[in-house]
From Swiss-Prot:
InterPro entries on file: OTOR, SH3-like_dom_sf, SH3_domain
Record protein name field: Otoraplin
Keyword entries, A-Z: Disulfide bond, Secreted, SH3 domain, Signal
High-level lineage: Eukaryota, Metazoa, Chordata, Craniata, Vertebrata
Pfam families: SH3_2
Range of residues in the leader sequence: 1-23
Subcellular locations according to the entry: Secreted
SUPFAM superfamilies: SH3-domain
Family (UniProt): Belongs to the MIA/OTOR family.
Record-annotated disulphide pairs: C35-C40, C58-C132
Main location per the UniProt record: secreted
Organism expressing this protein natively: Aquarana catesbeiana
Length: 133
């Protein structure tokens, strides 16, 4: 009985030690971001997609022309050659009471309709900001 107990404990311990991570850390799009608050959980603004956008990888979100978008962060453009990206989620009745899929998209594709917060906080980006599940 005691031998079985020790075998079970060892197997459980090995199971906790050997955990797999399925996410992928992708290249950072920027070193700084602008947010409405210090945790970047409140929306900066609300906008409308002016054109379709197909996400090139898991960091980005698909947009369809006319969709409404909540904007949560604005990445700080590092140089003139770099694109300017915002992160947000598409508004739909399905996600009325919860936040939908959040991802990046080019800022040139979305027109802000309502700005909730004018004074934004500049914060450093982290690897988690560009993490793909």
């Amino acid at each position: 009985m005691a031998k079985t107990f020790y075998v079970v404990v060892i197997v459980l311990c090995l199971g906790f030690i050997h955990q797999k991570a399925y996410g992928v850390y992708m290249q950072k799009l920027s070193d700084k971001k602008l947010c409405a608050d210090d945790e970047c959980i409140y929306a900066i603004s609300f906008g409308r997609a002016e054109d379709d956008y197909n996400a090139p990888d898991c960091r980005f979100v698909n947009l369809k022309k006319g969709e409404l978008v909540y904007i949560y962060t604005k990445l700080v453009k590092e140089n003139d050659d770099a694109g300017e990206f915002w992160s947000g989620s598409v508004y739909s009745d399905q996600y009325r009471d919860q936040q939908g899929l959040v991802g990046y998209f080019p800022s040139s594709l979305v027109t802000e309709l309502t700005v909730y917060k004018d004074e934004l906080q500049e914060l450093p980006t982290t690897a988690v900001d560009f993490y793909c599940d």
